[in-house]
Amino acid sequence: MDTNKAKKLKVMNQLVEGHDLTTQLQQLLSQPGSGLEDLVAKILVCFNNTISVLDTFEPISSSSSLAAVEGSQNASCDNDGKFEDSGDSRKRLGPVKGKRGCYKRKKRSETCTIESTILEDAFSWRKYGQKEILNAKFPRSYFRCTHKYTQGCKATKQVQKVELEPKMFSITYIGNHTCNTNAETPKSKTCDHHDEIFMDSEDHKSPSLSTSMKEEDNPHRHHGSSTENDLSLVWPEMVFEEDYHHQASYVNGKTSTSIDVLGSQDLMVFGGGGDFEFSENEHFSIFSSCSNLS
């Protein structure tokens, strides 16, 4: 170590001398005259001596250089990235958080932005958010792939209207789809024909009609249940209730073409063997669905 200190002192002296000689050269250049060549030669000798001294320095061990580098990182990255001393080297125990002075590059997903008048594409999306954007006229909507939780697809997209052309949408796709697009999207149970009729007349719904339809959907229904008895109650309630806007009439001795599809056995369910006629075609759909329940 003493040898290195002596060499360091010699290098400093040579550099100071070279600096002084260069200053003198600058002064001589401003005055045309003699002594320039000798001064330049001295400067060259001074720098050559400095270089030769630097070449004789002992090489720094790799462990020392590693400790110096990690020490500088520890000083700039705070104490969140903990180190353990082990002789001349230090081992990192945990990851360094991305704080000031520690630049941690984050991997970003692939993005693609297009402008289109059509929002639909070949994939299935579900909207999960919307927010107002600063200095923007229109809000931005956020969508995720429908199969995010079923197939782990992380693809998302952002949709926002173009200010200068409100009919156009700026669509940004983030990430690639990893889902199987051929897989069926989970759908809610579709209502059968009876449920649709029941919902269409929701304002005028009948408790008896609701009961009969629930029994139709029950897979554990026993044979010989009281469905026919319920339908016998539904029939007069549907036809003769004043709250309904449909007009129905009971006619004896006359056959209606709209009721021909009902057999004699179906008519027995409703407690009558006569013929019926309806003023509107939509009555037929209601009564035919009720006959199918029997």
From Swiss-Prot:
Post-translational modification (record): Phosphorylated and destabilized by ASK7/BIN2.
Lineage: Eukaryota, Viridiplantae, Streptophyta, Embryophyta, Tracheophyta
Protein name in UniProt: Probable WRKY transcription factor 70
Region annotated Disordered, chain positions: 72-94, 201-229
Reported phenotype of the disruption mutant: Slightly reduced in size. In wrky70-1 mutant, not alteration of responses to both JA and SA. Activation of jasmonic acid (JA)-responsive genes in a COI1-dependent manner. Enhanced disease susceptibility to the necrotrophic bacterial pathogen E.carotovora subsp. carotovora SCC3193. Impaired resistance to the salicylic acid (SA)-monitored fungal pathogen E.cichoracearum. Enhanced JA-induced accumulation of anthocyanins. Compromised basal defense and reduced RPP4-dependent late up-regulation (LURP) of resistance genes (e.g. CML10/CaBP22 and LURP1) upon infection by H.parasitica.
Tissue: Expressed in leaves and flowers.
Swiss-Prot/TrEMBL keywords: Brassinosteroid signaling pathway, DNA-binding, Ethylene signaling pathway, Jasmonic acid signaling pathway, Nucleus, Plant defense, Transcription, Transcription regulation
DNA-binding region(s), chain positions: 114-182
Source domain of life: Eukaryota
